A protein has these predicted regions:
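Cytosolic catalytic domains that perform sulfur/thiol-centered chemistry
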Residues: 1-222
């Protein structure tokens, strides 16, 4: 996994997952969810046909009258097209972690960088193909300064090499647990990645998982 894109700084500390994913729009409301980690695509619609990704960060994105708040970073150019989020410490704490990860993917995010994450949110990122990168708070600050000064210059997150790169900056190393790194590189969730390495029932397990979560797999069931 190597991703290059616009990075948007949104450094509010202790941002709860409920503020990312509104409680009123749950997975049960989705008409269809398609996740393709090969193409890195996640599409989801509500029954009314609207994109659920539009509901990410609703309390920040919209004013009380429903119009966009121009002060919110993702409502500004070029950050509307951001696929990398630079976040504050303890990002994604709370009880809506899985929904928060899905909303971030639906609004185009591929990578989130922060000094720390809510632990359950962090785990859920690997199940939905979102790369969570933990960086020192000072490093996050320096990266934010560079991005804010030249927002159109893209940032690259290279999972295979475990490095963040941006023109004019020294590459920034990061660490991902080897099993989680493998899960993202292979496009599987962590538990399944481990199990598929062992045991004679690996094929049966994969077939069962394919029937439960067909969107994870790039090819149709033989």
């Amino acid at each position: 996994m190597r991703h290059t894109g616009i990075a948007a700084p949104f450094l509010q500390p202790d941002l709860e997952s409920e503020l990312i994913a509104p409680v009123g729009v749950e997975l049960e409301d989705l008409h269809a969810v398609h996740v393709d980690l090969g193409d890195v695509r996640l599409d989801a619609h509500r029954h009314d046909g609207s994109w659920t990704g539009q509901h990410a960060f609703p309390g920040f994105r919209y004013r009380p009258d429903g119009t966009e708040d121009p002060d919110f970073i993702l409502n500004q150019e070029p950050y509307r097209d951001a696929s990398i989020l630079i976040a504050g410490p303890n990002f994604g704490q709370g009880s809506q972690q899985a929904f928060a990860v899905i909303r971030l993917r639906q609004c185009g995010m591929r990578v989130v960088m922060a000094p720390s994450f809510g632990p359950v949110f962090y785990d859920d990122c690997f199940d939905f193909g979102l790369l969570p990168v933990t960086l020192d708070e000072q490093v996050v600050g320096r990266l934010t300064e560079r991005v804010s000064a030249s927002p159109a210059i893209e940032v690259t997150a290279d999972l295979a090499r475990q490095v963040i790169e941006r023109p004019g900056m020294t590459p920034i190393p990061f660490q991902i647990d080897s099993r989680r790194r493998l899960s993202l590189l292979q496009g599987l969730d962590v538990t399944l990645t481990e199990r598929l390495q062992h045991g004679a029932d690996a094929d049966a397990m994969r077939k069962r998982d394919r029937s439960l979560r067909p969107w994870i797999y790039d090819t149709p069931d033989p």
